[in-house]
Amino acid sequence: MRAVIQRVKAAKVTVLDELVSSIGPGLCVLVGIKASDTAKDVEYLVRKILALRLFEEEGKRWQKSVKDLNLELLCVSQFTLYHRLKGNKPDFLAAMKGEEAQELYNQFLDRLGQSYDSTKIKDGKFGAYMQVHIENDGPVTINLESPEQKDTDREVDK
């Protein structure tokens, strides 16, 4: 599971010119799910995202997390994070397919809400063609990826 995390002053998602979600200061999180991801990957990303110290305190950088400062998160599913180039054309065979990915993505959103504050967690519209408007702060962009699990670990998850 991958996440591209951007510190933002504001962010919003629209679909067909309709506002779906918006946040003020906080994090915009683009989330990619690969075919072999499980609940363990969800737990890892949720824990890391909420603990990342990307915000200042009293002029000192990298001191506070989104949770410490009670800020919002805007999460957007993005299967293109699991691409591979064939020449100049991307393919997305490594990405988890539709319904299964949506289930794991919803699990990710639920766990964020359970581990933090569900009213602070916003998201786009899964599977829709979205416009994501991000007002970067810094800019600060962090890439996270859950560690590969051994095959024996995956068998336990099934």
Curated annotation (Swiss-Prot):
EC number: 3.1.1.96
Keyword RNA-binding: yes
One of the GO BP terms on file: tRNA metabolic process
Superkingdom field: Eukaryota
InterPro entries noted in UniProt: Daa-tRNA_deacyls_DTD, DTD-like_sf
UniProt xrefs under HAMAP family: Deacylase_Dtd
Protein name per UniProt: D-aminoacyl-tRNA deacylase
Species annotation: Drosophila melanogaster (Fruit fly)
Origin organism lineage: Eukaryota, Metazoa, Ecdysozoa, Arthropoda, Hexapoda
